Design a protein with these regions (language model features):
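Amphipathic alpha-helical interaction surfaces in cytosolic regulatory modules
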Residues: 10-39, 43-91
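Short beta-strand/loop segment at the start of cytosolic alpha/beta domains
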Residues: 1-8
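Extended, charge-rich low-complexity interaction segments
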Residues: 98-104
Length: 104
């Protein structure tokens, strides 16, 4: 199962509203990942995103599903700025998970 999400439809030209990210996460991302499906975030027409938006969108799925989330979340048509923010959030989440595993 693959869930394609047109980000522009939900966020307009700039992804910054954490409440929208939370709703997308709850209504679309988590149910799809729980069925081992893939989620494709299509950023066509979106010029930028805040780090807090991306964090609100993917941090809980990564925490809950771990490697399944890393393997099944995809980003299409993300410009360089958005790709960099996604990378920052992924690095932060990976370091956070590694540190938690180290402490256990």
């Amino acid at each position: 199962m693959k869930k394609n999400i047109s980000m522009r439809k939900f966020v307009g030209g700039f992804a910054e509203n954490k409440d929208i990210a939370k709703k997308m996460r709850t209504d679309k991302v988590m149910p799809t990942l729980s069925k081992h499906g893939e989620v494709v975030f299509d950023f066509d027409g979106v010029s930028g995103a805040t780090q807090s938006f991306i964090h609100a969108l993917v941090s809980d799925p990564i925490r809950k599903f771990g490697s399944t989330a890393f393997d099944n979340l995809f980003y299409k048509n993300a410009n360089d700025d958005i790709q960099e923010i996604i990378s920052i959030v992924y690095r932060y989440m990976q370091e956070s998970m590694d540190s938690k595993n180290y402490e256990e």
